[in-house]
Amino acid sequence: MNEYLLDANVLVRFLVQDDAKQSAAATALFEKADRREIALHLDGLAVAEAVYVLIGRYGLARSDVANVLLAIVQNAGVETAEAGMVADALQRFAAANVDFADAWLAARAAVIGHPVASFDRDFDKFKDIRRFEPKT
């Protein structure tokens, strides 16, 4: 079985369907994965880039972006590295007004149990993690 690592541009084409040729190819790729003819691998970095593009370039709402990407992460035909943490980051991103990188770090902090060293008070929005503010 062939295996492929997904780039954000394939995710975006599959989700927005704005380029006839590339969108059709991306859709066919996901359909093959659904039928288990190929294996698709998804990394959190590609998810982060897709979030950035879908919101910044296409103006989609953060909750919509989180929901469609979460559906891909949970798709049985897609193997997502650290799927639980990626899903948690997407849920945090949808629920709180933070950027995806902060949601990712909050999800990581929840898994490893360490505070996040940051001056950014956005981390205080998450009650299950702690923020450490460096001082002199």
Where are these regions (language model features)?
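Short, well-structured N-terminal submotif of metal-dependent ribonuclease cores
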Residues: M1-L42, R57-N67, K135-T136
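Acidic, PIN/NYN-like endoribonuclease modules and their adjacent C-terminal/linker elements
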Residues: E3, N75, A106-T136
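Acidic active-site catalytic centers that drive phospho-/nucleotidyl reactions
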Residues: D7, D102, D120
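A generic structural signal for short hydrophobic patches within well-formed alpha-helices
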Residues: L11, V47, F123-D124
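Short, conserved alpha-helical segments within structured domains
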Residues: L42-A46, E82-M85
